[in-house]
Amino acid sequence: MAKCAICEKGVTVGIKLSHSHIRTKRTWNPNLQRVKAIVDGSPKRIMVCTRCLRSGKVQRAI
């Protein structure tokens, strides 16, 4: 799975626990959006998590 280009947030692995206590592995994926942003002075399409978008860490290109 892809990572956030700003904070490098990626997939988290953990354990799902059922009511009968059966443990199975599972993954949590970050909420990534493909946005057009200014990178090194030129517009480029990058994958960014929604937390970085909301906090203003990304300068969007028009």
UniProtKB/Swiss-Prot annotation:
Matching entries from SUPFAM superfamilies are given as: L28p-like
Q: Which InterPro entries match?
A: Bacterial_rp_bL28, Ribosomal_bL28, Ribosomal_bL28/bL31-like_sf, Ribosomal_bL28_bact-type, Ribosomal_bL28_sf
Tell whether Ribosomal protein is among the UniProt keywords: yes
Cellular component, GO annotation: ribonucleoprotein complex; ribosome
GO biological process per UniProt: translation
Q: Which Pfam families match?
A: Ribosomal_L28
Tell me a Gene Ontology molecular-function term this record carries: structural constituent of ribosome
The identity of this protein, by name, is: Large ribosomal subunit protein bL28
The protein's organism comes out as Desulforamulus reducens (strain ATCC BAA-1160 / DSM 100696 / MI-1)
Q: What is the lineage of its organism?
A: Bacteria, Bacillati, Bacillota, Clostridia, Eubacteriales
Question: What gene, per UniProt, encodes this protein?
Answer: rpmB
